[in-house]
Amino acid sequence: MRLIGMLDSPYVRRVAISLDLLGIAFGHESVSVFSGVKQFSAINPVVKAPTLVCDDGGVLMESSLILQFVEARSGRSLWSSDPAQLQHEFRAVGLALAACEKAAQIVYERQLRPTAAQYEPWVERITGQMLAALKALEYEVGLRPAVFADPGKQAAITSAVVWSFTQAMLGAQLGAADYPSLAALAQRLEQTAPFLKYPSAGPGVPGLGAGQ
């Protein structure tokens, strides 16, 4: 299998880390949806990251669907089997992905759209949504540490990946002191082998590639 997309995208990164934890062999190709449009479109004309090229040549998109597929294929899961615990994990990942989506929209608005064309009421709205999601996620991490204790579970993985992304792109707006539980979670997971193997920044991880 081939995973296409830049690791500065939290969606690509969560898939890469998850594939590694599931023990699934794959090749990662750092192709940007911005500077590498021609190369990306030759693989997937939709030019959406992450893209997973399956062993039979089939092409999948959307990080959550990709992860659902690879878990079904491998017979392993990064989710709890207990429904009560799973409910909390789903809430955490839902909040993290909501924060991620709004953070990416803010970045696109500020970095890609000409200043004169930026619509402040829209920026205020999505900023409020991002902050609400992060506040709720911070509460969950502090209230239910057991849900995030295992670095091999999706709740911890996605929450940490998203926090690192928001800090890298919008750190001036998001003081770590306001999210101590979330910041501590990310700091802990960023020191684990899968996170170090697939960093969000560094050689070969330039630019802006936050495609879902």
Where would I find each of the regions flagged by the language model?
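Long hydrophobic alpha-helical segments typical of transmembrane helices together
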Residues: 176-212
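Aromatic-glycine hotspot motif
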Residues: 52, 64, 130-138, 194
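Non-transmembrane alpha-helical segments in soluble domains
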Residues: 67, 71, 90-93, 134, ...
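GST-like domain detector, emphasizing the conserved glutathione-binding G-site
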Residues: 1-120
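GST-like fold's C-terminal all-alpha helical module
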Residues: 96-187
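Short polybasic/polar patches that bind polyanions
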Residues: 20, 168, 191
